[in-house]
A protein has these predicted regions:
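Conserved AdoMet/S-adenosylmethionine-binding subsite of the radical SAM
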Residues: 5-148
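Short, small-residue-biased leader/transition segments that mark boundaries at the very start
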Residues: 1-3
């Protein structure tokens, strides 16, 4: 079940889920929400924070104070739609030293930027510790197909 992180009482639900040692709890967030109340808890879920870059028109909503609080339990995913998005992702990764304290993924906006171009950028900038993530379902099936 997917629940938006900003729902009322979500913190209480996450606390209950994280107390169960048989459960692995991971929350994906769009990056605009302050995660510090959850990130500072000893028992907490893993977070995948999508960082929307300028091509999305949403970068101004990103909550940057989350970045230093993320750990190797978490992931930052930069959704890139242009060369300038790649450059910005690299800038943020270096500024916050992300690869030394959290997982970092680059993910292409399907059809907007070629994964091969992203790999070349990663090689040219020695982006070791950064993973390219492709939406495999859009490669395997028609990218407009629903329910896959």
């Amino acid at each position: 079940c997917a629940l938006p992180i900003f729902q009322a009482d979500i913190g209480e639900l996450l606390d209950l889920l994280c107390r169960d040692p048989e459960l692995y709890v991971e929350v994906e967030t769009n990056g605009s929400i302050d995660l510090s109340p959850q990130l500072k808890k000893p028992l907490r879920p893993s977070f995948t924070m999508d960082y929307k870059l300028s091509a999305s028109g949403m970068e101004h909503h990103m909550f940057l104070p989350n970045l230093p609080l993320l750990t190797m339990q978490d992931t930052v995913k930069f959704v890139c739609g242009s060369q300038s998005d790649l450059e910005r992702a690299w800038e943020i990764t270096r500024e916050y030293d992300l690869t030394h304290h959290t997982h970092v993924y680059l993910s292409p906006v399907f059809g907007a930027i070629q994964p091969a171009d992203m790999v070349e950028f990663m090689k040219d900038h020695h982006m070791t510790g950064v993973t390219l993530q492709i939406q495999l379902h859009k490669v395997i099936w028609d990218p407009n197909k629903q329910g896959v």
